[in-house]
Amino acid sequence: MINRQQGFTLLEVMAALAIFSMLSVLAFMIFSQASELHQRSQKEIQQFNQLQRTITILDNDLLQLVARRNRSTDKIMVLGEEAIFTTQSRDPLAPLSEAQTLLTVHWYLRNHTLYRAVRTSVDGRKDQPAQAMLEHVESFLLESNSGESQELPLSVTLHLQTQQYGGLQRRFALPEQLAREESPAQTQAGNNNHE
């Protein structure tokens, strides 16, 4: 009679366990790296969306700009490291048929976070609670592209320095009808010259 061995030897079982263990460790490492990469890419996407949303809201604010002198600043637009100007907006919770309302918006940088504060009373001094728009901002500057002589510029340039994207620059054209309208001070000066 032939004595046939049934099953595996101890050496074969140990070799199979070692191979299975190595494959399990490799699979875990691959899964862990894929999960880490996914989390990192989601964070990058979220930060980019936050930047894009901030620029879109600033663009909308500037496109809806109203040439109205603010009583607290006595200017139509305050530009620089803080920006204050009047814009028109519709309350998203109000019915669509409701007219747009005037708002004073205030963009400013505090503790590496860019904020947007809104005053629903355009000549009021008290902002509603500011909304954090963009984090990890090193500098924020809005500047006029029409020189210092003109109170209402034709366009403004945003200079934004972020930790993630470095220096960003974006030019925003102001509404064309504002460029054609003269401010009251310019109209008075023009009338005085004709007399």
UniProtKB/Swiss-Prot annotation:
Post-translational modification N-methylphenylalanine, affected residues: F8
Misc: Part of a cryptic operon that encodes proteins involved in type II secretion machinery in other organisms, but is not expressed in strain K12.
Biological role: Component of the type II secretion system required for the energy-dependent secretion of extracellular factors such as proteases and toxins from the periplasm. Part of the pseudopilus tip complex that is critical for the recognition and binding of secretion substrates.
Family per similarity comment: Belongs to the GSP J family.
Top-level taxon in the UniProt lineage: Bacteria
GO biological process terms, semicolon-separated: protein secretion by the type II secretion system
Organism: Escherichia coli (strain K12)
Protein name per Swiss-Prot or TrEMBL: Type II secretion system protein J
Keyword Membrane applies: yes
Pfam family, one: T2SSJ
